[in-house]
């Protein structure tokens, strides 16, 4: 039983994961005597490396599943990956471009083959990163959103929704990327503030009686205008509703319509309506049966409807049309305008709201069922609860979901068109006379298949599947608040529609990982952090513990190397404490552990504190309060176990009483064993390493039972005594620090006990006071002599007096403190002068002002302490 002198995370973490996998500790057992507990991993995209957000998300899941496994559940944590349509296709196309090829050179079939090769390579990278993090995944059940089982589920859902009239093909305004030439989901659109312009134009009334003013940021779209809208209650324009204007350049007559969507107070109160190029205009167009005129091609160039501008790029057209409108006197004002413009996350192109024929899911009926579910006992519990409002707000304001994508990589839409009649055929399998039909070229939005993830991974649509019947619905989903709408909501309504059950009981929401300044991590800022680099430098246990305990549910997490380093120091502390314990357990076995012997006050206290810690940690973990769990474990391990109990245990361990030695070893072995178990879900590698060296039974800590409170081991009276001893020792240490006296220098110490009971208690535990206070003379009584020139302290149940005569040069100390007081007076004056300066308060950033206020508080506090010390010395 021995640990190396220095903690080396690389040595500790090497080969351990393979050992766990070999032992099959992470595999679900289907053991009917155990209650099942299920989490499905949010499948990462097979596009490359996992980032810190993934590391955080999966660490939280690993903590939950490791804890449940130890609590005796049959745990299934199902791994898998997402084919990530556009993201993966973009990567493979980039690879081909570097080779001087395009996907069209390969053709669809060969391109898809190339993408599968990419998937195999990057899936391997992801698995190796999961291994580095120590994730307890059941790889025997790993799934991929494009594997055969999931493809079957996707076809089943598409066909079923189509036959119910909930999937339809129609025209709609979608986010269009003119570079990749595909529709984008909202999450693939990144909004950036752009300095543009607002172009003010006058459209002449057809009857020659005047004009109406409109403004736009996209003048090139005016070629597709089919109306001008005003608010029906707007007194300025009421009389114009029903009249027409002449569309400049085009010469088309378009109506003036009344619609309540128009904001009377914005701009002129009149709005040009282009139903084919704006989602709000599209809705207005539908209400007023306006024609939809598309003026662009899929590549962002102008089409035939753009007349003389045909063939121009949209931005070139903008320049030309502005020039022409100015010459005609139509465009009368251009003002600078900062506005938010959508860009494609993949290509960087400005996204075009674009009228397109696409496949859609009719969302209202599905959303209504999900909203109703939240009013029942079988609702999905959001943690923190406030995110339920976010979810319901989205569901109540939902629009139909565009599910088709103009890509080659993904689930091909199971729809065929008859080559002659144009008839549409939708089914699980192609039509029998396939030669007369052509399949839809599009694939489904990636979110369509990932929305089925909780049940498609369990064998659905085969409702007799053993896994589906045992492990579905799942228990917890862990995910970020940024995809509540894109993913969480879709999983809920699809699960309710197809399984009649909620897909998970709880949704644990975390925030985003930000840098130390609170900025979002991004390529442009260059502030991204690779979790594998952190693991290499500090180990997986340090990174995991920091990620898990660094914030509370729903909050963002600020990443800081200093904090990871502090955690690494904590792991070192645990290592050194365990090493000390093991050095004193030579030949001590699991069978030797005996907690029935006569225990010291320190033994009773640490066992009581252990019980309290087990109870608190278990309760907090059940509520997903991992930040609080971290604080409780840190305080127990660092303060109670390492700084106090182990130091006190040295008395019997180095003494001659063999029975006391055996009891101390037993307590130390038991407490360390239980502590490793509590810590294991957070720090799996180091706890397994230490636990294997400790006296133990069982093959691995991963399957050891979760600690239980043992009331018979608690002794609250002893715990109170220990608190008194700790208070006394701390008070003496503080006095020594104040008067600059090292522990090696003996002192005289008088302790006045408040009553005979306290006196007797302190006498019984005199050895601890002598060991940790180093008094040359120790007097414990209910009355003590009054000593001039003494440092005093009051603790609950006792008063301490430490004579200074012979300990320090009082005259010198008074001089030193007076000098220090003078300096502190100057600092207080300086900082208060600064804080009373109106100019400073107005101009300085808030954090700088707060820093100065903190300095003021600190200086005043120090000054009071110095004054008190001087008063004591001068008495």
Swiss-Prot record:
GO molecular function: aminoacyl-tRNA deacylase activity; ATP binding; valine-tRNA ligase activity
Any one GO cellular component localisation term in the record: cytosol
Coiled coil: 804-875
Keywords recorded for this protein, A-Z: Aminoacyl-tRNA synthetase, ATP-binding, Coiled coil, Cytoplasm, Ligase, Nucleotide-binding, Protein biosynthesis
Pfam families xref list: Anticodon_1, tRNA-synt_1, Val_tRNA-synt_C
Any one biological process term the GO annotation gives: valyl-tRNA aminoacylation
Annotated localization: Cytoplasm
Annotated InterPro entries: aa-tRNA-synth_I_CS, aa-tRNA-synth_Ia, Anticodon_Ia_Val, M/V/L/I-tRNA-synth_anticd-bd, Rossmann-like_a/b/a_fold, tRNA-bd_arm, tRNAsynth_Ia_anticodon-bd, Val-tRNA_synth_C_sf
Positions of ATP binding: 523
Chemical reaction(s) catalysed: tRNA(Val) + L-valine + ATP = L-valyl-tRNA(Val) + AMP + diphosphate
Tagged with keyword Coiled coil: yes
Documented EC number(s): 6.1.1.9
Motif extent ('HIGH' region): 44-54
Motif 'KMSKS' region mapped to chain: 520-524
Recorded family membership: Belongs to the class-I aminoacyl-tRNA synthetase family. ValS type 1 subfamily.
Family annotation (PANTHER family): VALINE--TRNA LIGASE, CHLOROPLASTIC_MITOCHONDRIAL 2, VALYL-TRNA SYNTHETASES
Protein known as: Valine--tRNA ligase
Species this protein is from: Anoxybacillus flavithermus (strain DSM 21510 / WK1)
């Amino acid at each position: 039983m021995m640990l190396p002198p220095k903690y080396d995370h690389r040595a500790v973490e090497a080969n351990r994961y393979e050992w766990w996998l070999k032992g099959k500790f992470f595999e679900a057992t289907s053991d009917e005597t155990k209650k099942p507990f299920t989490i499905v991993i949010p499948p990462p995209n097979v596009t490359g490396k996992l980032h810190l957000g993934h590391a955080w998300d999966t660490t939280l899941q690993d903590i939950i599943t490791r804890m449940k496994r130890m609590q005796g559940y049959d745990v299934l944590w199902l791994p898998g990956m997402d084919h990530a349509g556009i993201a993966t296709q973009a990567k493979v196309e980039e690879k081909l471009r570097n080779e001087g090829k395009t996907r069209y050179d390969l053709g669809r079939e060969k391109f898809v083959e190339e993408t599968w090769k990419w998937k195999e390579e990057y899936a391997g990278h992801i698995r190796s990163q999961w291994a580095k993090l120590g994730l307890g995944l059941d790889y025997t059940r790993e799934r991929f959103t494009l594997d055969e089982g999931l493809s079957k589920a996707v076809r089943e859902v598409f066909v079923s929704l189509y036959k119910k009239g909930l999937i339809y093909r129609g025209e709609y305004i979608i986010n269009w990327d003119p570079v990749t030439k595909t529709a984008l989901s909202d999450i693939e659109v990144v909004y950036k503030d752009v300095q543009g312009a607002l172009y003010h134009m006058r459209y002449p009334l057809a009857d020659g009686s005047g004009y109406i003013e409109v403004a736009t940021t996209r003048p090139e779209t005016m070629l597709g205008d089919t109306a001008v809208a005003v608010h029906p209650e707007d007194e300025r324009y009421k009389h114009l509703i029903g009249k027409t204007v002449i569309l400049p350049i085009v010469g088309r007559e378009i109506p003036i319509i009344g619609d309540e969507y128009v904001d009377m107070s914005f701009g002129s109160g009149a709005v040009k309506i282009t139903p084919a190029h704006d989602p709000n205009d599209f809705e207005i167009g539908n209400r007023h049966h306006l024609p939809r005129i598309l003026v662009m091609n899929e590549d962002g160039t102008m089409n035939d409807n753009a007349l003389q501008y045909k063939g121009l790029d949209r931005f070139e057209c903008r320049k030309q049309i502005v020039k022409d409108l100015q010459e005609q006197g139509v465009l009368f004002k251009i003002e600078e305008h900062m506005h938010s413009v959508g860009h494609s996350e993949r290509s960087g192109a400005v996204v075009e709201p674009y009228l397109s024929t696409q496949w859609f899911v009719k969302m209202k009926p599905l959303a209504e069922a999900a909203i109703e579910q939240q009013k029942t006992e079988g609702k999905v519990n959001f943690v923190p609860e406030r995110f339920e409002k976010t979810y319901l707000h989205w569901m109540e304001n939902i629009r139909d979901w565009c599910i088709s994508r103009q890509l080659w990589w993904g689930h091909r839409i199971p729809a065929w068109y008859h080559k002659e009649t144009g008839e549409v055929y939708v089914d699980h399998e192609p039509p029998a006379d396939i030669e007369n039909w052509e399949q839809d070229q599009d694939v489904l939005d990636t979110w369509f298949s990932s929305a089925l993830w909780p049940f498609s991974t369990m064998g659905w649509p085969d409702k007799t599947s053993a896994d589906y019947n045992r492990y579905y619905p799942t228990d917890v989903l862990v995910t970020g608040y940024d995809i509540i709408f894109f993913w969480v909501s879709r999983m809920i309504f699809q699960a309710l529609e197809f399984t009649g059950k909620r897909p998970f009981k709880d949704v644990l929401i975390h925030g985003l990982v930000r840098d130390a300044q609170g900025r979002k991590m991004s390529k442009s800022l260059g502030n991204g952090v690779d979790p594998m680099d952190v693991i290499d430098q500090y180990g997986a246990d340090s990174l995991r513990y920091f990620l898990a305990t660094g914030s509370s549910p729903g909050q963002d997490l600020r990443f800081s190397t200093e904090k990871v380093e502090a955690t690494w120091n904590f792991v070192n502390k645990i290592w050194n404490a365990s090493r000390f314990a093991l050095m004193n357990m030579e030949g001590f076995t699991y069978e030797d552990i005996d907690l029935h012997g006569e225990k010291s006050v320190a033994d009773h206290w640490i066992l009581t504190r252990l019980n309290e810690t087990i109870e608190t940690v278990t309760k907090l973990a059940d509520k997903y309060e991992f930040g609080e769990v971290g604080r409780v474990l840190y305080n127990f391990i660092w303060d109670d176990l390492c700084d106090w109990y182990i130091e006190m245990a040295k008395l019997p361990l180095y003494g001659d009483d063999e029975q006391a030695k055996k009891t101390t070893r037993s307590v130390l072995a038991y407490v360390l064993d239980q502590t490793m178990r509590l810590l294991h879900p957070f720090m799996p590698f180091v706890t397994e390493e230490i636990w294997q060296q400790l006296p133990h039974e069982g093959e691995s800590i991963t399957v050891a039972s979760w600690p239980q409170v043992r009331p018979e081991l608690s002794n609250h009276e002893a715990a109170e005594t220990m608190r008194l001893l700790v208070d006394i020792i701390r008070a003496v240490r503080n006095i020594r620090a104040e008067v600059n006296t090292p522990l090696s220098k003996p002192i005289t110490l008088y302790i006045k006990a408040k009553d005979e009971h306290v006196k007797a208690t302190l006498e019984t535990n005199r050895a601890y006071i002598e060991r940790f206070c180093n008094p040359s003379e120790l007097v414990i009584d209910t009355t003590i002599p009054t000593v001039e020139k003494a440092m005093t302290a009051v603790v609950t149940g006792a008063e301490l007096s430490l004579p200074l005569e012979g300990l320090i040069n009082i005259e010198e100390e008074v001089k030193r403190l007076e000098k220090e007081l003078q300096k502190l007076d100057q600092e207080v004056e300086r900082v208060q002068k600064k804080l009373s300066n109106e100019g400073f308060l107005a101009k300085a950033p808030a954090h700088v002002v707060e820093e100065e206020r903190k300095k003021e508080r600190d200086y005043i506090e120090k000054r009071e302490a110095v004054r008190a010390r001087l008063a004591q010395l001068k008495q």
